[in-house]
């Protein structure tokens, strides 16, 4: 299954999920980007980074993201949102909640879901949102995550067991080839 990024979303959002004539390629939805990576300090955090000033980046404006999500919902397309930081994950959950309007069967996903607060973690199950988490990121981030988050927030990262215990569907396949 494939997802179109925002630049190629128009066709998916006008026609809905599609399969090519050979049946080999399926486009099920769109992929958006809420924030950047933790290593570069681009992940959107609720509190400043522990090792530098700043809260990270918000890459998709709210009005644009919500409009695309509502169109996706209307045509039955899935949405995958890249969100790494706790602020990025919270905003994504807020937008999903608004766009889905109570539909818990849409199978929308948050790609990475690396840093999630105790308050937001159960919202994944409540909203039917899949946490698509890549184990290789925990290994790759091992050397800088403690410095970026500080010891007080480190427990909010890489929460596979917490997600499973909360009844969240976790997908552990690799979303891309950024971490080898």
Question: Across the structure, where does each feature detected by a protein language model lie?
Answer:
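Metal-coordinating catalytic core of metallo-dependent amide/deamination hydrolases
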Residues: 1-86, 90, 123-130, 135-136
């Amino acid at each position: 299954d494939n997802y179109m990024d925002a630049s190629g979303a128009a066709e998916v959002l006008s026609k809905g999920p599609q399969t090519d004539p050979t049946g080999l390629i399926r486009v099920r939805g769109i992929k958006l980007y809420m924030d950047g990576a933790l290593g570069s300090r681009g992940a959107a955090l609720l509190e400043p980074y522990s090792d530098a000033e700043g809260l990270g980046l918000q890459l998709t404006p709210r009005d644009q993201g919500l409009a695309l999500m509502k169109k996706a919902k209307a045509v039955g397309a899935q949405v995958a949102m890249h969100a790494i930081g706790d602020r990025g994950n919270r905003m994504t959950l807020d937008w999903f909640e608004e766009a889905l309007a109570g539909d818990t069967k849409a199978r929308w996903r948050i790609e990475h879901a690396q840093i999630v607060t105790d308050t937001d973690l159960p919202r994944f199950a409540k909203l039917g949102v899949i946490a698509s988490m890549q184990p290789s990121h925990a290994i790759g981030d091992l050397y800088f995550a403690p410095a970026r988050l500080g010891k007080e927030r480190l427990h909010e990262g890489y929460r596979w067991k917490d997600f499973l215990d909360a009844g969240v569907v976790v997908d552990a396949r690799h979303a891309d080839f950024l971490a080898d």
